[in-house]
């Protein structure tokens, strides 16, 4: 039986004492994560050296001497000495260090499965967060209870009804938030089937062009806020390091980055929700976003569009509502191929927005690409 899990991010309203406690708990989580990363590397190196020596001398490996790292062993090791070496850890919830190490273990699992890069150390001011298991907090009305702290006000009620699984407390744009995961008592109401299909060509001048001829404009939040962003960045760089004025400038800059991110995500949520509601099958390109942003002339515009976030939202919403997502390979010539006869126009450039094929069909570049994507998408990302 499928589990229906939803997350709700709610802004918190801590007083100065509570905000200071959040910062301390985040510091404990960060210290634990970074210590565990070094310990993981040390154990892995020692284990590898022992195996290499056994192989070099032709000696059988003694399993009792193996020291392959795991998050469970490292958590146990930290517990053995944290009371003496890190007594300040006892002032915050036990989940802060323990779940941080569990998250490191998950990061290594994803790395070895080829799903993500090698884990990096967490940075202060960038990765200010800690997690809580469901037995370590409770929610009542517009308040959340934090261990060793008490009740903290929230700006809204929890949206979902069901079993609360976990929470993550994090700082973004100078504000504190709680991301709460809930397993729903019953599945959400699904969008009705429409029997319609659509191909989507993502672009830079507009967010997306659909195979039915619709053009979805971009909100371009970064472009609209770029002048203000540059001014705040310049102001921050001129402030003396370690000064209160520099910290204030950093907060202003961080809040603007957060505002831009929220505007972009909100626009993408509206677009992806509408697409999943209207179409039963959606075909997209498997874009190499990392490679695309290497183009200095287009990198800012591509980042402003949020292609990765668009795809992520589209996939999880399609799964929720039983819709299908198909994709074509990143090297498929969707723009150069005539959607009518299949002929390739090798001379097509980015500047050419329209063109006529030898079969006398006049194409709009992006609409033609979207039609080809719908016709030739064959890789299932989400199946009904």
Language model region names:
Residues 1-384:
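Nucleic-acid substrate recognition interfaces
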């Amino acid at each position: 039986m499928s589990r229906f899990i939803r997350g709700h991010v709610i802004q918190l309203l801590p007083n100065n004492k509570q905000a200071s406690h959040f910062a301390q708990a985040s510091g404990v989580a960060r210290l634990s994560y970074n210590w565990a990363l070094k310990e993981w590397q040390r154990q892995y190196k020692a284990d590898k050296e022992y195996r290499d020596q056994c192989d070099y001398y032709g000696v059988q490996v003694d399993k009792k001497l193996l020291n392959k790292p795991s998050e469970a062993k490292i958590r146990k090791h930290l517990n053995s000495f944290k009371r003496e070496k890190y007594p300040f850890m006892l002032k915050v919830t036990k989940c802060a260090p323990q779940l941080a190490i569990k998250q490191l273990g998950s990061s290594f699992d994803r790395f070895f499965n080829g799903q993500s890069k090698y884990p990096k150390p967490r940075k202060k001011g960038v990765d200010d967060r800690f997690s809580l298991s469901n037995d370590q907090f409770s929610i009542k009305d517009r308040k959340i209870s934090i261990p060793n702290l008490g009740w903290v006000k929230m700006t809204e009620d929890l949206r979902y009804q069901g079993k609360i699984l976990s929470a993550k407390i994090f700082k973004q744009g100078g504000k504190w938030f709680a991301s709460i995961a809930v397993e729903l008592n019953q599945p959400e109401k699904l969008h009705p089937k429409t029997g319609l299909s659509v191909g989507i060509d993502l672009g830079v001048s507009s967010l997306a062009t659909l195979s039915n001829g619709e053009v979805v404009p971009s909100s371009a939040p970064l472009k609209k806020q770029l002048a203000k962003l540059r001014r705040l960045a310049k102001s921050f760089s001129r402030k003396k390091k370690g000064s209160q004025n520099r910290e204030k400038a950093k907060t202003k800059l961080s809040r603007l980055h957060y505002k831009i991110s929220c505007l972009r995500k909100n626009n993408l949520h509206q677009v992806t929700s509408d697409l999943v509601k209207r179409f039963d099958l959606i075909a997209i390109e498997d874009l190499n976003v990392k490679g695309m942003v290497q183009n200095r002339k287009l990198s800012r515009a591509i980042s402003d569009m949020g292609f990765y976030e668009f795809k992520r939202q589209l996939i999880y919403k399609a799964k929720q509502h039983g819709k299908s997502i198909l994709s074509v390979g990143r090297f498929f010539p969707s723009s150069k191929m005539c959607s009518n006869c299949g002929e390739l126009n090798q001379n097509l450039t980015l500047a050419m927005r329209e063109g006529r094929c030898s079969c006398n069909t006049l194409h709009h570049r992006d609409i033609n690409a979207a039609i080809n994507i719908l016709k030739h998408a064959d890789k299932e990302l989400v199946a009904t």
